């Protein structure tokens, strides 16, 4: 039910969910079962769920992968962005994503229509729904779309929180929703503390564990801008003193 052109791009997103679940040295990952309200471990090829954690890769520091979703990067910045992206990704990340080092198609900027189409396409393939969010998984998604679709990864960012995090790029239909994760076993030496169910809250400045949720209404309502215009700075249309005061009141750093 995506927009026209989705069928032509059905092949690239095949296996995206498996790549997001896959971690270096492990064959499983985790997602949140909203029906059962519990963590499920997906074992590749087994089709079974287990209430046991698996391990995720190293934590990606917030701010290392900077996005500017409210504007398209200038043509001259594409080269520097590409170099930054390659510098940020190590060999383990390339193995994890499983896509070519060189993009299959020419690089292009994300657009509203492209974001909307890719959102529906990923939903049809079950790529993000219920997956725990982490900085590393966001990188995997960015790299995957760049290599397969040529989409420069200077677009994927969300509102600061706490609570539901709305995408700042209008047309991207995936938001981040906080969930409660049982903490029993956290103090056990055998408990895997580097699973995304555990590390997501450490990546988040508010200590919340987040999962991706598809929201088709985001195609028509720019919730990020409506609810939090101050996060867009000078692009918000607010007086500078006002948007800075709002950011300061929410504890969000600004320059």
From Swiss-Prot:
Record field: compositional bias (Acidic residues): 87-96
Region (Disordered): 1-100
Chain positions covered by the region annotation Acidic: 87-95
Residues carrying lipid (N-myristoyl glycine): 2
Major site of localization recorded for this protein: host cell
Positions of region (Mediates dimerization): 139-155
SUPFAM superfamilies according to UniProt: Regulatory factor Nef
GO MF annotation list: GTP binding
Domain of life: Viruses
Keywords, ordered alphabetically: AIDS, Host cell membrane, Host membrane, Host-virus interaction, Lipoprotein, Membrane, Myristate, Viral immunoevasion, Virulence
Motif PxxP: where in chain: 103-106
GO CC terms: host cell plasma membrane; membrane
Notes on the domains: The N-terminal domain is composed of the N-myristoyl glycine and of a cluster of positively charged amino acids. It is required for inner plasma membrane targeting of Nef and virion incorporation, and thereby for infectivity.
Subunit details: Homodimer. Interacts with host CD247/TCRZ; this interaction induces down-regulation of cell surface TCR/CD3 complexes.
Protein family membership: Belongs to the lentivirus primate group Nef protein family.
Protein name, per record: Protein Nef
Originating organism: Human immunodeficiency virus type 2 subtype A (isolate ST)
Lineage: Viruses, Riboviria, Pararnavirae, Artverviricota, Revtraviricetes
